[in-house]
Amino acid sequence: YGSRVHEVIHSISRTDLNAILLDAAEATGRVRIEFGAELEAVEFDQSVLRFTDGRTEPFGVVFGADGAGSRVRAAIASQGNCRFETRWLDHGYKELTLPPADDGSHQLDPNALHVWPRGEFMLIALANPSRDFTVTLFAPTPTFEALRSPDAVREFFVSEFADFAAMVPDLVDQFEANPTGPLGTMRATGWSHEDRAVLVGDAAHAIVPFHGQGMNLAMESVRALDRHLRELPDDLGAAFQRYECERKPDADAIADMALHNYIEMRAGVIDPDHMARRSLELELERRHPHRLSPRYNMVMFSTMPYAEARDRAARQ
């Protein structure tokens, strides 16, 4: 996907990665992991976490990694320290599964991201080790609202994605059984409360998935937070502030670029002018690798901060 042989994109199972991270945390001997514990509220005045089952736990510092609908963020906001806004796209998504072929092999090339761009909507497919594919339809909300009957679903896929429809015998059943998910961007300012709580991951910066950078953004933020905590071990509040000052510009930058990449994926790749520009960018990078690089390549294949990649691309 870049101009160099090593510029590839690796797709891994989120479930497997979560298991690896949980195992690593548990192996330290300093982490107690509890499943099925749903946070209801953070009570700063009493220094307790309250859970939906009525249980409470005392705390010293809370690291809120509880996702886009973060209860920790809501608690920080209640103290007047955090402001946040979620902007929803008038688009949604639905996941489907492309099964293995009759002989157990992949039905499509497993070493590629497959995209069926259709202007206002698109279908993408990523291979799994089990030789099936996770397929996602991204489309405007009115499109999903029009697909209310089996006949409408069947007609839509046969008309727009005939090759895909022919490979999935239970397509209609899958479509009706699987939920339609929302797509939105959450931006926040004030990621911490004194030296008592701090946000990480989607709780601080939730973005749409079209650049494949949401988890990377979160991990980069955790690395930055860790560095500031090591530099200021006796002043957590200052460490939290420095962490946000460093990461907020990059979070906003990749949020914008992810939204732009949705347009590029569903419409740009079928625009001859856009593709000609892309080819020119790659050729210029090949000839002048230290002077020019496409924005996509800077984001995906370098450790350049997101804001720097955005600004450099704008100058080019």
Annotate each language-model stretch with its function.
Residues 1-24:
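Active-site-adjacent segment of FAD-dependent monooxygenases/related oxidoreductases
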Residues 3, 203, 212-213:
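C-terminal lobe/hinge of AMP-binding adenylation domains
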Residues 11-12, 33, 56, 216:
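Short aromatic/basic micro-patch
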Residues 22-23, 28, 34-183, 187-193:
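Conserved FAD-binding catalytic core of PHBH/FMO-like flavoproteins
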Residues 65-66, 200-202, 220:
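Active-site flanking residues adjacent to catalytic metal/cofactor-binding acidic residues
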Residues 192-209:
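Short FAD-binding loop at a beta-strand-to-alpha-helix junction that anchors the flavin cofactor
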Residues 209-221:
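A conserved FAD-binding loop/helix module that cradles the flavin
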Residues 227-316:
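C-terminal helical "tail/cap" subdomain of flavin- and related membrane-associated enzymes
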